[in-house]
Amino acid sequence: MSNLSKGTGSRKDTKMRIRAFPMTMDEKYVNSIWDLLKNAIQEIQRKNNSGLSFEELYRNAYTMVLHKHGEKLYTGLREVVTEHLINKVREDVLNSLNNNFLQTLNQAWNDHQTAMVMIRDILMYMDRVYVQQNNVENVYNLGLIIFRDQVVRYGCIRDHLRQTLLDMIARERKGEVVDRGAIRNACQMLMILGLEGRSVYEEDFEAPFLEMSAEFFQMESQKFLAENSASVYIKKVEARINEEIERVMHCLDKSTEEPIVKVVERELISKHMKTIVEMENSGLVHMLKNGKTEDLACMYKLFSRVPNGLKTMCECMSSYLREQGKALVSEEGEGKNPVDYIQGLLDLKSRFDRFLQESFNNDRLFKQTIAGDFEYFLNLNSRSPEYLSLFIDDKLKKGVKGLTEQEVETILDKAMVLFRFMQEKDVFERYYKQHLARRLLTNKSVSDDSEKNMISKLKTECGCQFTSKLEGMFRDMSISNTTMDEFRQHLQATGVSLGGVDLTVRVLTTGYWPTQSATPKCNIPPAPRHAFEIFRRFYLAKHSGRQLTLQHHMGSADLNATFYGPVKKEDGSEVGVGGAQVTGSNTRKHILQVSTFQMTILMLFNNREKYTFEEIQQETDIPERELVRALQSLACGKPTQRVLTKEPKSKEIESGHIFTVNDQFTSKLHRVKIQTVAAKQGESDPERKETRQKVDDDRKHEIEAAIVRIMKSRKKMQHNVLVAEVTQQLKARFLPSPVVIKKRIEGLIEREYLARTPEDRKVYTYVA
């Protein structure tokens, strides 16, 4: 822009001079400058820019803009660029439609961008001043707009470009190898031509691309479904999604990833969810039945991509789980073993917990569905609370199960999961109390620690009110041990004899234990009765004012029994009932572990050889139901426990049947435990009805107590609100029906704890 002129003086006198810009410019001068610039622009477009002085061109453009001829320069530029693109570039591209189209277009695009960068540099001052003042497109963008409108969006070029790109992608989807670079270049060009927006790319490529893809995937889904199992279909869809993502990454603009994936998801998953899930011999149920955790995980991952996908899976899983659960708890198997019943439910829960962890990502929806399903079918069977208590009873009893304390702990934790699903927790509590009492009183608990651990679990779950009675039972046992130590010391000190009876008495607090209000009668034999009377006198002397009532149904005894050998057969051989050959007429001694009722019956046979059912009933005064059960255990049990024989030899016990001691009785064991018939099967129907009646009576009191508590604090309440509040308070123990609550409210009104308001009969007030 400047030149140095030679001076005659010393070096100091040499000065740099800037050539002055003309003050005014006539039209002729302006035209000559424009011609110079126009020629330069055309040379740049023809790639003949090596001879141009960019410095001079910049100065000329600067001069034009400075003297207010920016518009002429801007308009002229637009015309020159437009002319070149129409006459030269567009023609070249049109000529290449059937031969190297994308390469030609890409070359033209690259040349145009290079030219526009040079032109922009020359006209930089116009960009800074004229463009800013007049709010028009800058030089480079102007070039892009003209290229877009005159070349890329020119009728047949636009159509051909779109079709070429779509064809190449369609071919690649079918497995052909295509020029990915050419696709990428074209897509980048369309994005740049949108001038920082994506409208050109979207309209000229993306929208038709998505439309074509939808049609393609629609057809592909039909083909995939017809030819593949659910698991293979899922893998193919997964592969298709990954392929589309990879194509976007290498060929298209990143912004296309989301919409194309949505198209794949809609066409290959959303539209066929039910079909995939319900596929026969390969769908969700097939996977659940056969424990295919990996296939389920793939299905979960795929379905989690689409709206309602997991809901569809959940619904199908739920109907299968409910079907399985209902089969387990169905009433059909009346002789169902409670331990097997609960174990079946625990196994089912374990299976679905595994699916939840390994396949369903511990998803909340699946978790809630599984919990809801278990709650649904567990409560279909009214025996579930009793059976759960019997299951826990089985695990907490001493026995040859070979379980470590840790294994027992794990089983109890699983049982607690079922307990949480149980609506009638008060029924469970009643049975648990019975079974715990039996374990404690027969010294059958595997360990005190395990028992207390279980009570602590129940306490955590339901609060101390739920377990206070159970804890009271343990306190009674501890106090009883101390009392028995004191009693034995008293016997030693006084020299009183119990007549050969080794007596252990457990003194139980009535409110804690499942004692019976009307204690079953029983004429205890003289020897144990005498021993107990000595204890009674000792105890009441220490605790005046207390009353001791024998609970025969909860007691047990160890009897020394002598059997006098088998009967000789006609051939002279001797055989015992158990099938073991016995020689000689040697007697066999056993200790029989029996209930108080069984002891009372067996001790009769010290006096006489035979008794009829009626005679036993008369002598013992045992209630008929208890007597039948005791005799069945003694005379109709396993051969290794059959210490009595009866005539006739039927399973039933009826009046007129005759009982004798079975002198052929043999057992490999010295101590023989006489099992109570059907003890593991839970209660009989009459017993169950009785328990249910007791539960209902307890519930009446609990419901009334809750109503009074609520009304005392709220003073006045509308009927429906009170019912809802009572239900909320009691649901941790049982679900009271609104009808029962209404009856209890009416009972309280009759007893004047509550009153109806005169203005509204459905509103109650608390009567202090």
UniProtKB/Swiss-Prot annotation:
It is found in: Nucleus; Golgi apparatus; Cell projection, Cilium, Flagellum; Cytoplasm. The modification Phosphoserine is found at residue 585. Disulfide bonds: none annotated. Residues 677-698 are annotated as: Disordered. Keywords: Acetylation, Cell cycle, Cell division, Cell projection, Cilium, Cilium biogenesis/degradation, Cytoplasm, Cytoskeleton, ER-Golgi transport, Flagellum, Golgi apparatus, Isopeptide bond, Mitosis, Nucleus, Phosphoprotein, Transport, Ubl conjugation, Ubl conjugation pathway. Residues 2-41 are annotated as: Interaction with KLHL18. Residues 698-760 form the Cullin neddylation domain. Pathway: Protein modification; protein ubiquitination. There is a cross-link at residue 712 (Glycyl lysine isopeptide (Lys-Gly) (interchain with G-Cter in NEDD8)). GO terms for cellular component: centrosome; Cul3-RING ubiquitin ligase complex; cytoplasm; glutamatergic synapse; Golgi apparatus; mitotic spindle; nucleus; plasma membrane. GO terms for biological process: anaphase-promoting complex-dependent catabolic process; cell migration; cell morphogenesis; cell projection organization; cellular response to amino acid stimulus; cellular response to oxidative stress; COPII vesicle coating; embryonic cleavage. Neddylated. Attachment of NEDD8 is required for the E3 ubiquitin-protein ligase activity of the BCR complex. Deneddylated via its interaction with the COP9 signalosome (CSN) complex. Transmembrane segments: none annotated. PANTHER family: CULLIN (PTHR11932). Forms neddylation-dependent homodimers. Component of multiple BCR (BTB-CUL3-RBX1) E3 ubiquitin-protein ligase complexes formed of CUL3, RBX1 and a variable BTB domain-containing protein acting as both, adapter to cullin and substrate recognition subunit. The BCR complex may be active as a heterodimeric complex, in which NEDD8, covalently attached to one CUL3 molecule, binds to the C-terminus of a second CUL3 molecule. Interacts with RBX1, RNF7, CYCE and TIP120A/CAND1. Part of the BCR(SPOP) containing SPOP, and of BCR containing homodimeric SPOPL or the heterodimer formed by SPOP and SPOPL. Belongs to the cullin family. This is Cullin-3. It comes from Rattus norvegicus (Rat).
